[in-house]
Design a protein with these regions (language model features):
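Aromatic (Trp/Tyr) and acidic
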Residues: 1-63, 67, 71, 101-134, ...
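Long, well-ordered core segments of solenoidal/helical folds
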Residues: 1-27, 72-89, 142-158, 194-212, ...
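C-terminal beta-rich recognition modules with glycine/proline-rich loops and embedded aromatic residues
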Residues: 4, 247, 312-320, 325-415, ...
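Substrate-binding cleft and catalytic face of glycoside hydrolase catalytic domains
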Residues: 83, 88-97, 129-130
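Asp-box/WD-like beta-propeller blade repeats and closely related beta-sheet repeat scaffolds
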Residues: 95-116, 123, 137-164
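A surface-exposed regulatory interaction patch that couples sensing to output
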Residues: 207-224
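Flexible glycine/proline-rich, aromatic-decorated loop/lid segments
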Residues: 259-276
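Extracellular Ig-like/FN3 beta-sandwich strand-entry sites
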Residues: 421, 474-476
Length: 620
């Protein structure tokens, strides 16, 4: 869904072309779009690079798309590099601005210009471009080092104290520093990691909106802008041990007081951010980018603590809050993801989610396996073939065959190049990590577990079963995760969900839609729910079937597939919790040049939205 066509025009790659002209002393146009618009281009480059590393397995559409990506990268990369200033600085809004307007870079009065936000996305795009080319094309990598060196030369102890209004540079610098060390050795990237910590430590005497209200070590409640917050917490979890007390408290506050059942965050009271504890309005916020940030945070926590509960949660967020952020054709997207109402749009005046959604989804292989403690952690169950390098001195191919999340049977073939002894840690899903929600019936553990047909003892530690043995090519792990329809009740402190129930099957949260039943504001009946596969519906989904209290049939579909059918216009409002609009500059389409076209109608309280809800009335 990454719109390379829309990044061609104003606010896109053209800004780099004009900045290069300015650096050459040629006549040029001014910067177009938001001051941080470079970020959309960098996100798009990163997404194209990751997508180009996917094995198409002969799929003609994927091959065609990858050819288009290569053509676009060949066009864009020289333009991006040409816009980099001689000292390594890169942000076209500054290069193209009057120095009377912005007399200095890294100005504390101009934190909203997002210098680190755009620079961080550039660095992350360079990492993936280097990886895509197997280090054969170092153009972006070298440019990213030049940029990072520029920041190190200007910011740091004894130089200048500063922090950005929108975090991203911090986690990018940590990632890049470690990547440079892996590629070049000798601690070449250490200065970048140190700068990341310095930028975090500079955050104080500011606003809770951008998490600078108190030093990061003293932050224990998630506040402010949800995307900025999760990027901040992700970097904290990754970079230093002395942040861990705060990080654990922040994680606990999010998951047990500010976490939607879909895995989304941010109820919107604080301008695209967190509200008070237990304030989880169903018509509100849940920005797609905040879900991306939460996934990054959960992943970093999983890396730090090797506890499966973090993977349980990023699986929830991935399947529900993020996967459903696009329509099934990948042509429209949600900037916000309210649990009732809302319609996707083709573009937005601030299209940060357009690049963030695909780059995060394309990182699924990263979320699936983690290598550490002399073994391999299996965190997600997805039919796939992935190579894990240097496990106990050998490379290991992991082949998963599964229809999860439609059923719970999983087979993993372990193919080390050479027979070696190591552990494979199998995640045992737990749907009860958040204290905000209780499920009926309770489901836990594994139904069975075997290696090469021989039953294994199921002993769970921190959410994993460790299977340690001398592995040889062809060894097969087989297990089954129990999958039954469940009803979910929310903590009574969540006023918006009192008297309501949600439905779940495995990791999937379900919606009821007017496309399947006319009245979705009535109470659900007490009859058992049944899972039924519908290959003819929404590209193939497992539906849940039951009865409403009046005996009429009830059909529920996975939340990710919501609002993909025509004719869903009227908002379904449950318990007086109405849809809240955050679309702002959302547009229903674009002009040929990629600029915004017809504005979508604003939807305030009680306005139009989709006939689809997560929470439905419980039978009293």
């Amino acid at each position: 869904m990454n719109r390379t066509d829309l990044n061609q025009g104003a606010g896109g790659i053209d800004n780099f072309v004009e900045a290069a002209k300015a650096l050459r002393g040629e006549p040029h146009k001014g910067h177009k779009g938001l001051v941080f618009a470079n970020a959309w281009v960098h996100q798009t480059v990163e997404s194209m690079c990751i997508a180009s590393m996917v094995d198409p397995k002969g799929d003609a559409d994927i091959i065609k798309a990858q050819e288009k990506f290569k053509e676009t990268l060949d066009d864009w990369i020289p333009k991006i590099i040409a816009a980099q200033e001689p000292d390594g600085y890169l942000q076209t809004a500054y290069t193209l601005s009057s120095r009377n307007r912005w007399p200095s870079k890294w100005n504390p009065d101009q934190r909203a210009n997002h210098e680190g936000y755009t620079a961080g996305y550039f660095i992350e795009s360079a990492i993936n471009h280097y990886t895509m080319t197997d280090g054969q094309d170092k153009r972006l990598y070298d440019a990213a080092k030049k940029l990072a060196d520029c920041w190190v030369a200007n910011l740091g102890p004894g130089k200048k104290e500063w922090f950005d209004g929108h975090q991203e540079m911090e986690q990018a610098l940590v990632r890049f520093g470690r990547f440079v060390n892996d590629m070049e050795g000798n601690g070449r990237g250490d200065s970048y990691v140190k700068l990341a910590k310095f930028l975090l430590d500079c955050r104080s005497n500011g606003s809770d909106y951008d998490q600078s209200h108190v030093p990061v070590q003293q932050q224990y409640e998630a506040v402010g802008h949800a995307v900025r917050a999760t990027y901040n917490y992700s970097a904290m979890a990754d970079v230093a041990a002395d942040y861990q007390s705060a990080v654990l408290s922040l994680w606990d506050n999010i998951v047990n007081k500010k976490y939607y059942v879909t895995g989304g965050i941010g109820s919107g009271e604080s301008a695209e951010g967190f509200g008070p504890n237990y304030s989880l309005r169903n018509g509100a916020y849940c920005e797609s980018c905040s879900t991306c940030g939460l996934i990054f945070f959960q992943w970093k926590m999983n890396l730090a603590y090797h506890d499966a509960k973090y993977a349980d949660l990023y699986e929830e967020s991935m399947y529900n809050a993020l996967l459903g952020a696009t329509d099934l054709e990948g042509k429209t997207f949600y900037y916000t993801n309210p649990l009732q109402g809302g319609q996707r749009t083709a573009w937005h005046v601030c299209p940060c989610c357009v690049g963030n959604i695909p780059r995060t989804l394309l990182m699924v292989p990263t979320w699936t396996y983690v290598k550490d403690n002399g073994g391999i952690y299996v965190n997600m169950y997805i039919g796939s073939t992935i190579n894990v390098e240097k496990v106990a001195g050998t490379d290991v191919q992991m082949v998963q065959k599964t229809e999860y999340p439609w059923n719970g049977k999983v087979a993993i073939t372990v193919n080390p190049k050479a027979s070696r002894r190591f552990a494979v840690y199998v995640r045992v899903p737990d749907r009860t990590t958040s204290e905000l929600y209780t499920t009926t019936p309770k489901v836990s553990g594994l139904k069975s577990l075997s290696v090469n047909g021989k039953a294994e003892t199921i002993k769970v530690d921190k959410g994993y079963v460790a299977i340690t043995r001398d592995w040889k090519a062809g060894d097969k792990i087989e297990f089954e995760i129990p999958m039954v329809p469940q009803r979910i009740k929310a903590d009574q402190n969540i006023e918006a969900d009192r008297g309501l129930v949600a439905l779940r099957y495995g990791p999937l949260i379900y919606n009821v839609e007017r496309a399947d039943q006319a009245n979705i504001t009535q109470a659900i009946g007490s009859d058992p729910l049944v899972a039924e596969w519908r290959g003819d519906l929404l590209g193939g989904v497992m539906t849940l079937k039951g009865k409403w209290a009046d005996g009429s049939p009830l059909v529920a579909i996975p939340n990710y597939a919501r609002n993909n059918r025509l004719g869903q216009v009227a908002t379904a409002t449950v318990a007086g919790d109405s849809t809240i609009d955050y679309s702002g500059g959302a547009t229903t389409g674009t002009t040929g040049s990629g600029t915004a076209a017809t504005p979508a109608p604003r939807r305030g309280r009680g306005g139009a939205g989709g006939g689809s809800v997560v929470w439905i009335r419980d039978q009293q």
